Amino acid sequence: MDRDEEVIEGRAFIGEELLQTPVAITVRKGIIRKIQEILPRKLPWITPALFNAHTHIADGVAMDIPLTGPLEDIVTPPSGLKHRILEQTPGEDLVRGMRATISAMEAAGIRGFADFREGGIPGVRALSKAASGLSCHPVILGREGGELVAHGAGISSARDVPGLEAVVAEVRKAGKMLAIHAGERDPGDVDAALTFAPDLLVHCTHATREQLRGISDEGIPIAVCPRSNWIFGVTDSARRPPLREMIDLGCRILIGTDNCMAVQPDLWREMSFISTVYGLDPATIFRAAVSGSALTGDPYFIREGLPANFLVIDPAPTNLWLSRDPLKTLVTRAGSSNIVKKVISS
């Protein structure tokens, strides 16, 4: 066997369909070269690595600070609570805090994340520094002048960014990505966001059926963050965000965790919450926790020819070996402690 070649056997969840198959996966120089079926037997589970489709990890420096008042008083730029805290935090403390959070995501099998990075060019550079040398890579969506040195722009809302048209024009001219918060507290900014044909919408918690139909028709993915929506008080019902309606209309949903100050960026917890509160089927939930990887250009699904980005989960040391439905067990019970190996392309 080539020194750059590795063969991993397990019950793998193959392709976007997450078809459960006992296989031997041959990885050579970071690429999945061959997936070969083998005889069924007791095997570890092999799953795609996860992608956190929406974060604000810098505000983790204010982790679990008491949050009172309306959402806009907490997170809206430029004078919301989180922005005041970020401005007052020394740069090295921000970098150290972000690196700790990225390391926590890495330990949980999260290979990448899309972060709305405040603070202009220095903010983008701080996140790049924080992620240096780690295998959990950011898609950085900058603000306040940081858009063109990042992977693109992360817009707080189409209704509260002065000169948004000019920002979008610059981003598009540079061939960068455009992501916009929309419909988090009401549907009033969704239509305006859609006029910019974004590459990603975040939240859509209160988007109307007509708006969701338009989003589906345009093929724009939606990063939903239900735990954050509940914590910030913009929902108290399984009807919001309207996950079932999104799926029925053909929307492509991704899963994010939003503000680290309020929510641990752990997609295992997010998946379990969605399963419990919204009752979606396990395959839909797990697929949404991986699909955001398309933002990197190389999705993490397990297919021949793609970069190898997958997790080996051993159910044997815990009671997970009792599972009659491994995919449901992954969504509702698994976590970082069950991961015994990560196969990650460089």
What is each model feature region?
Residues P44, T55-H83, R99-F113, V124-L141:
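Catalytic pocket of metal/acid-base enzymes, prominently hydrolases
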Residues S291, E304-S346:
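C-terminal cap of metal-dependent C-N hydrolases
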Residues P187-F301, I313-T318, R333-G335:
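Active-site-adjacent C-terminal substructures of enzyme catalytic domains
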Residues G10-R11, I25, G30, L43, ...:
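Divalent metal-coordination and catalytic microenvironments
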